[in-house]
Curated annotation (Swiss-Prot):
Recorded catalytic activity of this chain's protein: Hydrolyzes single-stranded DNA or mismatched double-stranded DNA and polynucleotides, releasing free uracil
Active-site residues, Swiss-Prot/TrEMBL: 70
Gene3D superfamilies xref list: Uracil-DNA glycosylase-like domain
Pfam families: UDG
Name assigned to this protein: Uracil-DNA glycosylase
Lineage: Bacteria, Pseudomonadati, Pseudomonadota, Gammaproteobacteria, Pseudomonadales
Localization per record: Cytoplasm
Calcium is among the record's keywords: no
Stored PROSITE patterns: U_DNA_GLYCOSYLASE
Family note: Belongs to the uracil-DNA glycosylase (UDG) superfamily. UNG family.
Protein keywords: Cytoplasm, DNA damage, DNA repair, Hydrolase
Chief location: cytoplasm
Length: 230
């Protein structure tokens, strides 16, 4: 996170977001992160993985957007895709509930791992609205500037991509609905898949079959939600 030319970003995203890297909030965010690293703090995900969501799902390929809040803050978990964990890491509770709903909705076997890279490569943008976090300190990088950047990402998708399904789970994700043109896209809302709330409507929401139905109606390939074994 130094200057625009040194940031590894998929070309479509880099072009669409170029102006953001000169905004005052981005300079402040860079300085905040520089100080965190200089203080010896452990920041997740590792630097090369911060923009994994954008690099794994090129702008022109976005079909679905799933919004998370901030990265997992345990060692070895976060790799830049919301809800996803690196191979070899136990599946987190919210993702377990996502798998349960996938099984109920589409009879997809529950995966033995939590690595969602294959979704990202099919056009599912797995975006945390805050893209970094300090180890063992949830929401430690909230309100430091990331939200301006990720709000712009949501707007860019709404403006430039046709027929996208936005899955907004929980109040935080639903607060972003104002950034989305509901006349062009499908917005599906539910409570968060966290064990604290999933039983209040996430389990039973049918979002995955509804997503694929929407895509197929528009002549687009559905998402294969079944994860390959590692």
């Amino acid at each position: 996170m130094t200057d625009d030319d040194r940031i590894k970003l998929e070309p479509g995203w880099k072009n669409a977001l170029r102006a953001e890297f000169d905004q005052p909030y981005m300079h402040q965010l860079r300085e905040f992160l520089r100080q965190e690293y200089a203080a010896g703090k452990e920041i997740y995900p590792p630097g090369p993985m911060i923009f994994n969501a954008l690099n794994s799902t090129p702008l022109e390929q976005v079909k679905v957007v799933i919004l998370g809040q901030d990265p997992y803050h345990g060692p070895g978990q976060a790799h830049g895709l919301c809800f996803s964990v690196q191979p070899g890491v136990p599946t987190p509770p919210s993702l377990v509930n996502i798998y349960k709903e996938l099984h109920r909705d589409l009879n997809i076997p529950i995966a033995s791992h939590g690595y969602l890279q294959s979704w990202a490569e099919q056009g599912v943008l797995l975006l945390n609205t805050t893209m970094t976090v300090e180890r063992a300190n949830a929401a430690s990088h909230a309100k430091k500037g990331w939200e301006f950047f990720t709000d712009r990402i949501i707007q860019v998708v709404s403006e430039q991509c046709p027929n996208v399904v936005f899955l907004l789970w929980g109040a935080h994700a639903q607060s972003k609905q104002k950034l989305i043109d509901g006349t062009k896209h499908l917005v599906l809302k539910s409570v968060h898949p966290s064990p604290l709330s999933a039983y209040r409507g996430f389990l039973g929401c049918g979002h995955f079959s509804r997503t694929n139905g929407f895509l197929e109606q528009r002549g687009l390939a559905p998402i294969n939600w079944a994860l390959p074994p590692l």
